[in-house]
């Protein structure tokens, strides 16, 4: 389950970072 969790995290991380950067600006 750890492998699939990392895959999901890798997919979600860029979206979360993108939203965070948009809110910063």
Swiss-Prot record:
Keyword presence, Zinc-finger: no
Family indicated by similarity: Belongs to the non-disulfide-bridged peptide (NDBP) superfamily. Medium-length antimicrobial peptide (group 3) family. Ponericin-W subfamily.
Cell location: Secreted; Target cell membrane
UniProt tissue specificity: Expressed by the venom gland.
InterPro entries: Antimicrobial_4
GO biological process entries: defense response to bacterium; defense response to fungus; killing of cells of another organism
One protein family per Pfam: Antimicrobial_4
Cited function: Has a broad spectrum of activity against both Gram-positive and Gram-negative bacteria and S.cerevisiae. Has insecticidal and hemolytic activities. May act by disrupting the integrity of the bacterial cell membrane.
Principal location: secreted
Keywords, ordered alphabetically: Antibiotic, Antimicrobial, Cytolysis, Fungicide, Hemolysis, Membrane, Secreted, Target cell membrane, Target membrane, Toxin
A GO-annotated cellular component: membrane
Descriptive protein name: U1-poneritoxin-Ng1b
GO molecular function, one term: toxin activity
């Amino acid at each position: 389950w750890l492998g699939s969790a990392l895959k999901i995290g890798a997919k979600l991380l860029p979206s979360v970072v993108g939203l965070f950067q948009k809110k910063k600006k």
